[in-house]
UniProtKB/Swiss-Prot annotation:
Annotated ranges, domain NPH3: 200-509
Family: Belongs to the NPH3 family.
Tagged with keyword Cell inner membrane: no
Region (Disordered): 361-399
Positions bearing Phosphoserine: S567
Primary role: May act as a substrate-specific adapter of an E3 ubiquitin-protein ligase complex (CUL3-RBX1-BTB) which mediates the ubiquitination and subsequent proteasomal degradation of target proteins.
The protein, known as: BTB/POZ domain-containing protein At1g67900
PROSITE patterns reported for this sequence: NPH3 (PS51649)
Keyword terms of this UniProt record: Phosphoprotein, Ubl conjugation pathway
Domain comment quoted from the record: The BTB/POZ domain mediates the interaction with some component of ubiquitin ligase complexes.
Biased segments, Basic residues type: 370-382
InterPro entries referenced in this protein's UniProt entry, alphabetically: NPH3/RPT2-like, NPH3_dom, SKP1/BTB/POZ_sf
Pathways per UniProt: Protein modification; protein ubiquitination
Length: 631
């Protein structure tokens, strides 16, 4: 870092009791009071360089000159006083702002004397400070102590312009970075890490700035248009990780604020909130400029710090654009207040999903013409038609990417449902709404969804039958794997109609496989046998489908398995036949009573035969007829 020395005389200032004096053969004739400190000085050296002191002495006959609100305090005043006496002073990036403001206050300009302090400081500032990377940043940091003076003297704006111009003109000049050079010395970084770090060499250095100065600097860098959006995003991530407290610490801050509304806690939260909202306003508009994980971390902090609704909605919109990159842990956003009974903020995730579905609602384009006619037409195409084809191909790729994204998001949502299902205070409506927000085609299988439903039913054992049916109506039994079906068959938390539906579709699969010649034997597949055996059903004797009363079993763990089916103790409580009859009566009351309009999805769910008892006989008779034919 650069510095400048002015004057040649040794320092003769000394302290006597409560006074600061100058050792001289001439007695002092001038008393100045600055910030409670008194100086016994001489008029001639001071008045010859300070126009303000000249005017104050001529206007006031008092022997003591008061300098209230002196910029920089006694340190800055003493620098100016020593300059007047010709005593050696050292000016650097750390004290040039204080010295410049003090010199301006005392009016040490060229009007009073050529080569005065203001002129010398300006020359050093423009020729040395602004040309140095580290000097510019340090000087900009020191302007925080003198915001009004620094703005009036254009010190702040000139430092910001100098920093931005160096970032824009030297994007690969890593040697400028103080933080990067220090890190390379301390850390033996790999070549890949060093290369990635060198691209954003400036990010860590300007991260030392306060949020107001940082925001203005980043605006200047962004307006230059030469720095890629990804590097802007990396710089914001570096700054957020440095100044935003961790989420755990944030939660403690919020909890303390709720427990005791002290001014200090309120100020801390307000500062963090301002910092967060400023970072959000600086986010690049380009998709992928910042990672989805970073956006969701900002959203978590926004929820905890109670940021503005507009800031949270902006983050939700940005997250929706790249939601397929998120993980389940990223979506576990804590609620706004510790007073909330819910473990996670499900509403904000529902908003993100809604935004994701809205921006992905583009119909896939139709396929191009094929065949000889299409080939002949293709030969006669004009250049404009070729351009249309290119747009068509881009549209297809975009549509394919959208479809792939929805498949990933569906998997993500099912994993998220498994996590929030453990919350005993999670309302049924929120769980169902979130499960239904995913398009049906995006779930290739329903195993993860079934696992989430199973967890929810076990965590909410006080649900009545209609509520359990409402939870299960989004489940498509045709998309369950063999393992999931076998688990569902012994899951006493499921509505019995779902169990029957599982058996029905498994039998239908077995029959279809037999008709297609995939089975040379008339025996039921082993998984169907296991399902029926779990309910004490003899597949060879439909009339003997009596179901013995059993004792209830303990609910399986969240990670269900089929090992329980092999145990002779694994049975459903109550008789299946009586429960089917009871279940049928409840369905009829629900469909014909005061249930109102029946949702279309629920109608599809109830598309199995109307009388489950007859359905069981029908299933078994199909198998029996098949056996007779092969005899």
């Amino acid at each position: 870092m650069k510095f400048m020395k002015l004057g040649s005389r040794p320092d003769t200032f000394y302290t006597s009791e409560d006074l600061r004096c100058v050792s001289s053969e001439v007695s002092s004739d001038f008393t100045i009071e600055v910030s409670g400190s008194r100086y016994l000085l001489h008029k001639f050296p001071l008045l010859s360089k300070c126009l303000r002191l000249q005017r104050m002495c001529s206007e006031s006959p008092e022997s003591i000159i008061q300098l209230p609100e002196f910029p920089g305090g006694v340190e800055a005043f003493e620098l100016c006083a020593k300059f007047c006496y010709g005593i050696t002073i050292t000016i650097s990036a750390y004290n040039i702002v204080a010295a410049r403001c003090a010199a301006e206050y005392l009016q040490m300009s060229e009007e009073v004397e050529k080569g005065n302090l203001v002129y010398k400081l300006e020359v050093f500032f423009n020729s040395c400070i602004l040309n140095g990377w580290r000097d510019s940043i340090v000087t900009l940091q020191t302007t925080k102590a003198f915001p009004l003076w620094s703005e009036d003297l254009a010190i702040t704006s000139r430092c910001i312009e100098a920093i931005a111009s160096k970032v824009l003109s030297h994007p690969s000049k890593v040697s400028l970075s103080h933080s990067h050079s220090r890190r390379v010395r301390d850390d033996d970084m790999s070549s890949n890490r060093a290369a990635a770090s060198s691209r954003g060499w400036w990010a860590e250095d300007i991260a030392e700035l306060g949020i107001d100065l940082y925001w203005r600097t980043m605006i200047a860098i962004k307006s230059g248009g030469k720095v890629p959006a990804s590097l802007i995003g990396d710089a914001l991530r570096v700054y957020a990780s440095k100044w935003l407290p961790t989420l755990q610490r944030n939660r403690k801050v919020v909890k303390k604020k709720e427990d005791s509304d002290s001014d200090s806690d309120t100020d801390t939260s307000s500062k963090h909130r301002l910092l967060l909202e400023s970072i959000i306003s600086l986010l690049p508009a380009e998709k992928g400029a910042v990672s989805c994980s970073f956006l969701l971390k900002l959203l978590k902090a926004a929820n905890i710090l109670n940021a503005s609704t507009s800031s949270k909605m902006e983050l939700a919109r940005r997250v929706a654009l790249q939601l397929e990159e998120a993980t389940v842990s990223d979506l576990l956003i804590p609620p706004m207040s510790y007073k909330s009974e819910l473990l996670y903020d499900v509403d904000i995730v529902a908003t993100i999903l809604e935004q994701f579905m809205v921006q992905g609602q583009t119909s896939p384009p139709t396929s191009p013409l094929r065949g000889k006619k299409g080939m002949m037409d293709r030969r006669r195409r004009s250049r404009s038609a070729e351009n249309i084809d290119l747009e068509f191909q881009e549209s297809r790729r975009s549509s394919s990417a959208s479809h792939s994204s929805k498949l990933k998001v569906a998997k993500l949502v099912d994993g998220y449902l498994q996590q929030i299902a453990r919350d005993v205070n999670l309302p049924l409506s929120k769980f169902v709404t979130l499960a239904e927000s995913v398009p049906e085609f995006s779930r290739l299988d329903h195993d993860d969804l079934y696992r989430a439903i199973d967890i929810y039913l076990k965590a909410h054992k006080n649900l009545n039958k209609s509520e359990r049916k409402r939870v299960c109506r989004v489940l498509d039994c045709k998309k369950l794997s063999m393992e999931a079906c076998m688990h569902a068959a012994q899951n006493e938390m499921l509505p019995l109609r779902v169990v029957v539906q599982v058996l029905f579709y498994e039998q239908a699969r077995a029959a279809a496989a037999t008709n297609n010649g995939e089975k040379n034997t008339t025996e039921l597949p082993s998984n169907i046998k296991a399902l029926l055996a779990a309910h004490n059903i003899d597949p060879s004797n439909p009339n003997a489908a009596a179901f013995s009363t059993t004792t209830s079993i303990a609910a399986p763990e969240d990670r269900w398995s089929v090992s329980g089916l092999k145990s002779p103790k694994s049975k459903l409580s109550g008789t299946l036949r009586s429960k089917l009859a009871e279940d049928e009566e409840v369905d009829e009351r629900f469909m014909n009573g005061d249930g109102g309009r029946t949702p279309s999805r629920f109608k599809a769910f109830c598309a199995i035969p109307g009388r489950p008892k007859k359905m069981f006989s029908k299933l078994l008779s199909i198998n029996r007829n098949s056996s007779d034919k092969n005899c």
